[in-house]
């Protein structure tokens, strides 16, 4: 069993896209997977299937029902704003302790081979009134899968996020460079290679938007190999 926090170097870089691809690859290999996103903003109840929670359920092969949405993403807010701002509009005060309690409760009952806990926004985005995603990650202490983009400026955002994670002594399991949708974005392969050159030896995986998800299979196999090593060493 392995557990990872899926973080973003920026907002909308493709965290859920990456999580879904990893879930599909893990299941295709005959292993179990599950996911949890404690807080979600920009949620449209009439289009629940298109939400991050709905996409995660689809990747898990589960129907998008109210009960399952509550299980995978218990705090869902309508406004497309930072979670504490969206929550405030609905009369809810989001706190770090509440998110930690929800996350730890999920971690205590999940036993899949691959367990992904996904943040909201970028590493330094506010996720509660008194916490950023970084604070939540620090409180949980999970190894991190960092998702970066390929838009102009993405390399700087990704490398900055890596440095910030290191200041909290968080383990960085991998960086996934998710291809940005912007057709005018810099060359994807070059962005991946430049990120690799400056990432300090962290494993880098390239995730094209419309290509074969071989990267996801490679990453899930690497994570499975780590699990086997930990088990044999125990």
Curated annotation (Swiss-Prot):
Cofactors named for this entry: Mg(2+)
Active-site residue numbers: 37
GO cellular component terms, A-Z: cytosol
Binding-site positions, substrate: 41
The keyword Magnesium is annotated on this UniProt entry: yes
Keywords in alphabetical order: ATP-binding, Biotin biosynthesis, Cytoplasm, Ligase, Magnesium, Metal-binding, Nucleotide-binding
Cited Pfam families: AAA_26
Class of enzymatic activity (EC top level): ligase
Annotated localization: Cytoplasm
Main localization, broad class: cytoplasm
InterPro entries (UniProt xref): DTB_synth_BioD, P-loop_NTPase
CDD domains according to UniProt: DTBS
Example of a GO MF term: ATP binding
Pathway it works in: Cofactor biosynthesis; biotin biosynthesis; biotin from 7,8-diaminononanoate: step 1/2
Sequence positions that bind ATP: 12-17, 52, 118-121, 178-179
Gene Ontology annotations of biological process type: biotin biosynthetic process
EC numbers: 6.3.3.3
Reaction it catalyzes: (7R,8S)-7,8-diammoniononanoate + CO2 + ATP = (4R,5S)-dethiobiotin + ADP + phosphate + 3 H(+)
Binding site for Mg(2+): 16, 52, 118
Family designation: Belongs to the dethiobiotin synthetase family.
HAMAP family: BioD
Function text: Catalyzes a mechanistically unusual reaction, the ATP-dependent insertion of CO2 between the N7 and N8 nitrogen atoms of 7,8-diaminopelargonic acid (DAPA, also called 7,8-diammoniononanoate) to form a ureido ring.
PANTHER family: DETHIOBIOTIN SYNTHETASE
SUBUNIT field: Homodimer.
Name of the protein in its database record: ATP-dependent dethiobiotin synthetase BioD
Taxonomy of the source species: Bacteria, Pseudomonadati, Pseudomonadota, Alphaproteobacteria, Caulobacterales
